[in-house]
Amino acid sequence: MLKVCRESVQREPEGVQSRIQLVQADMRSFSLAQSFKLVTTPFRTFQHLTAVDDQLSCLVSIHRHLVEEGTLILDIFNPSLEALVRDNLGQEFGDEPEFTTPDGRRVIRRHKIVSKDSFNQINHIELLYYVSHPDGREERLVHASPMRYLYRFEAEHLLARCAFEMQQVYANYDKSPYGSKYPGELIFLAKKVKS
């Protein structure tokens, strides 16, 4: 992902490039030499932390890097009870619209749940990428990883334990109020408070 991001940054004007610093680090414990007004955890990255201690360590590291009253935007999915109990292990689902890359490849992304650990709230998932190359070659790429799902009040409790104060919870990136779309997203806006 950093490679793709670096390529994207190189296409930006010099003034933008000079303000961007890419850092590869462990989100559970990182140390940068600066503080920020805003920290985001996009694309459900927080849910790849499958142990509560790791989640707390991550939030403590983020807290340490925010200025006083800085904002954290935490993005996770809102677990659908119907989906959690569905007997769909090994079945592909979630057709997303096909997209075309700049080099002409057509890509369809799907999902698959390989195993479920309901007691620890962990699904082992695969993201499947079906790629059609301009030369006619077909390719299937698989990215496997565990994802721990959290419910709203569990996430709020973790944030409170790490000295964050809830400001808002949204159901989507369009700022739809929580509960207006189900299952939707859980997007938390939390403010750093003194620990």
Predicted ranges, named:
Residues 142-195:
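C-terminal lobe and adjacent flexible extensions of AdoMet/dcAdoMet transferase-like proteins
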Residues 1:
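Conserved short alpha-helix immediately C-terminal to the canonical SAM/SAH-binding motif I
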Residues 9-13:
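Conserved hydrophobic residues forming the short capping helix/wall of the S-adenosyl-L-methionine
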Residues 33-53:
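A short SAM/SAH-binding and catalytic strip from SAM-dependent methyltransferases
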Residues 14-32:
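Conserved SAM-binding strand-loop segment of SAM-dependent methyltransferases
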Residues 54-71:
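A short glycine-rich, Lys/Arg-flanked "PGG" loop and its adjoining helix->strand segment in the class I
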Residues 74-156:
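SAM-dependent methyltransferase
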Residues 5-6:
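Conserved SAM-binding loop
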